[in-house]
Amino acid sequence: MKNKKIRENELSYLAGLWDGDGTFAIQRLKTSKTKSKRAYWVRSTFTNTNETVVKMVDSILKKMGIKKTGLRSRQRKENWKMTYEFSINRLEDNKTLLTNLIPYLNGKKATAEIVLRFVSRRLLAKKETPYNPYTLDDDLQYDQVKQMNIKGKYPDHKVVSDIARRS
């Protein structure tokens, strides 16, 4: 955490919001350049329709030192409310977010722990050599997080714990 002014209740509030309206994901990059090789990126997103809540989330993220948030707003259908979405894509920012939220997360804790291990390993790999290929562990963690994030499926907590323990 870069700024010590952040309070514990702000972190628990943010974690509760992220448990309900957020996502931690490892996504596979698909471009013409990556067809023959693996490429992944980490993305943490938060979506909400309440502008006041979104501004509060932005304030807490800035206190953490996360300034590079992609904020967009859109109205998906004419009779729907305006939706605001943050996306955090930088590995360093995701590590900061995950490290701070994991102690307070409930439903998405196992997913966040897997993503944090992935992020930590990729940051270390960047320091070791300019080109550091993805490992089988990276592939496994991508698959695990993908399964845990399937819409409409709420994985059994025992299964989630087993997945987190294996990785």
Q: PLM features: what roles do these ranges have?
A:
Residues 1-167:
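Internal intein/HINT superfamily modules and their associated LAGLIDADG
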